Amino acid sequence: MLKAVMPRPWVCSRCVKRQIQSSRGLATASTQYREPRPVPTDHSAPGAKHDDRTLRQIFDSPDFWADFSQSSKQSYYRPGVGLFQNRYLVNPQGFEVFANTSLRKAQRIVDKVLKASTVEEYRHVARDLDRLSDLLCRVIDLSDFVRATHPNAAIQAAASRAYAKMFEYMNILNTTTGLDKQLEVAMGTPEIVAGWTEEEVVVADILKKDFAKSAIDLPRAQREKFVALSQEISEIGPDFVDYMTPAKSYLTFESSKLKGMDPVLVREHTTWGQTKIPTIGGAAAAAIRTVQNEEVRREIFMATRTASRNTVHKLEELMRKRAELAKLSRYESYSQLALGDKMAKSPASVTQFLEALAKDNNKIVQGEVSELLKFKFSNPNASSPGLQPWDKDYYMSRILASVRSHSRNSDFLSAYFSLGTVMQGLSRLFTRLYGVRLAPHETMPGETWNSDVRRLDVISETDGHVAVLYCDLFSRPGKSPNPAHFTLRCSREITTAELEEASMLSQNGLFKTDEEAANDGMATSKSSGVLKQLPTIALICDFVTMSGKSSRPALLSFNEVQTLFHEMGHAIHSILGRTSLQNVSGTRCATDFAELPSVLMEHFAADPSVLSLFARHYETDQQLPYEMVAEKLALDKRFEGSDTENQIILSMLDLAYHSDLPLSPTFNSTEIYHSLQQKHGALPVDPPGTCWQGFFGHLFGYGSTYYSYLFDRVLARRIWQVVFQGGEAGGSVHRGNGEKMKEEVLKWGGGRDPWKCLAGVLDDGRVENGDEKAMAIVGSWGVKE
């Protein structure tokens, strides 16, 4: 089965983490901290210092940016070069030309593969199918990004049409049994496989497994049923996510009963002394955290944890359809189908990991519960014994508020994090670890979708230009607030045969050279002696700038700094994972491995040696006192065990719902959820009558892989401690440590068994096999610092 890259359907760990911590205010507490170690000498290229200065200025100085971006202005004498320098995309009509040109190339490849009959022809099947995948992704991924991001409605519509055309063709290919059979012949011929590169073997295996998942080997009637079920799931899933509703939409109280809640918030929802609170949203969450009246908190808690009957029905129907699909595809469960190509490999292995992690985490949670109980017993207004479900957030909030009152340091943190200095810091860190830096590059007319977008070229000390990064980081009306990393074009080797094909296109005047035509005008490099299309990445954030004529730069909160580091972790994986084949480039790896580089980057964001590279006051140039960060980190981790317990139980719930249980006529999603809370939790269990699982929208996107968030947190923490020495003695900025991470993990993209990557980077052969024992070992490592 051929797949487009597209944004991952699961929520990245930063987003999940923000949901967990959104109920907490900004607060600080004292903790032990260490002074930053001296930073190693910088042996960078002569142009690096100029790039470093310019990098800060293009983000922090509006005047400098206005001068720098003059070249991007379009005029009669300077026609547009096309979005991302894709020569087809100079106007809306170009999307159709781009799609049709790519479609014709794809059809020629399909014909070639289907007609293969000699050993020499079969030898090219894996690489041909990889190029076929690349041609689909070139249109689908880029068009999907443009239709969601571009401000011009005509361009959005054109991108949507191009997307639909290529997506439809991709679905046709996924039911073309001849492609699967030809791949099977090639893989079954030892003489052919012996001549393949390691990447070709991996890609062939990936494609074969994907074809199997699409039930391509089933009889026609069953295959048609598979397609019908897949279509139903694709309709029920979004319907469940988009239209989930609570059993009660509002609760009404006398405003006098809401003592403790922000009076401004209460007034916003009050009419004639009656306060009407929506049961979904910020007001209800704030009430549970702050209202002193326990009975009011209980009523609001019950309503916020109870989905409507129709919502729960949709959820259970989705789970049933997925279970039927798995059975039809000859799998025991949907989890077994989904996990076969992941690091976990099986539901049993995920269970091993989660149970080991729960065991490690349980004693931490018990300590947190004891602290909450102690605080509750000191409260004269407490009206019930023990810790109730509606007490947890309230007393957590009270404890954090009591600590916050002793220090206000973190309120001033943002003054040390102008966006330009943070981008400088990322470039300096990547230079020290991996020998690559971010170099501002003037854009051509029509190259970007908004005048705020900055282009950065990624320059390697050894390989020259290795990637293009488009940064759309500032807030504007109508823009999505969600941070994201998009791969617009993957790394891939361009063959001599492709250049010969491209020579016909270069003759039409659209392209100057065959090399340019082979990659639609987008960035390429021949530094390694082989022509490659370069990774082209878009980074989206929503950082607020000062309005009017203020010269103050965009200042980031520490959480926003962590978010930017996280997203750049995805980017560096794409940048360093420059493989010869598209299917395994960069972030195209196992779902439960994809977040590792980005979660690891969050550790760097909090390290004193890394922060000393860039964190300085935007006005005084004073270096950031690290104790301010240490206090912020201590507060963020104050109830980390409880957060982790919730994630463990939700991961177990995801597995249980995607087992064969939904096929039983007595399947009851509420009973399963409450039973998992009872069995594995130290926190209070949801009371009877609630059914929160109806709000668990990630069940559709994750589909058996919700554990990935926890799994990659554990892996990242272990690598941080073992490879980078937890930042001690300058380990976070040491080139040798960065080289080990690059050589064992990042450079492979998805072209190597991730368990081998893990065993190699940790020098721990115990986990190389990736079996249930390995999963249990990983679980025992825990997530707590």
Swiss-Prot record:
Cofactor: Zn(2+)
Presence of the UniProt keyword Metal-binding in the record: yes
KW Oxidoreductase (keyword) present: no
Principal localisation: mitochondrion
GO molecular function: metal ion binding; metalloendopeptidase activity
Active-site residues, record numbering mapped to chain: E567
Signal peptide: none
CDD domains according to UniProt: M3A_MIP (cd06457)
Annotated compartments: Mitochondrion matrix
Transit peptide: 1-27
Keywords: Hydrolase, Metal-binding, Metalloprotease, Mitochondrion, Protease, Transit peptide, Zinc
Free-text comment on the cofactor: Binds 1 zinc ion.
Ranges where the record places region Disordered: 26-52
Residues bound to Zn(2+): H566, H570, H573
GO biological process, one term: protein processing involved in protein targeting to mitochondrion
Domain of life: Eukaryota
Gene Ontology CC annotation, any one: mitochondrion
Reaction equation(s) it catalyzes: Release of an N-terminal octapeptide as second stage of processing of some proteins imported into the mitochondrion
Top-level EC class: hydrolase
PANTHER family for this protein: MITOCHONDRIAL INTERMEDIATE PEPTIDASE, PROTEASE M3 THIMET OLIGOPEPTIDASE-RELATED
Reported function: Cleaves proteins, imported into the mitochondrion, to their mature size. While most mitochondrial precursor proteins are processed to the mature form in one step by mitochondrial processing peptidase (MPP), the sequential cleavage by MIP of an octapeptide after initial processing by MPP is a required step for a subgroup of nuclear-encoded precursor proteins destined for the matrix or the inner membrane.
Family affiliation: Belongs to the peptidase M3 family.
Protein name stated in the entry: Mitochondrial intermediate peptidase
Organism of derivation: Sclerotinia sclerotiorum (strain ATCC 18683 / 1980 / Ss-1) (White mold)
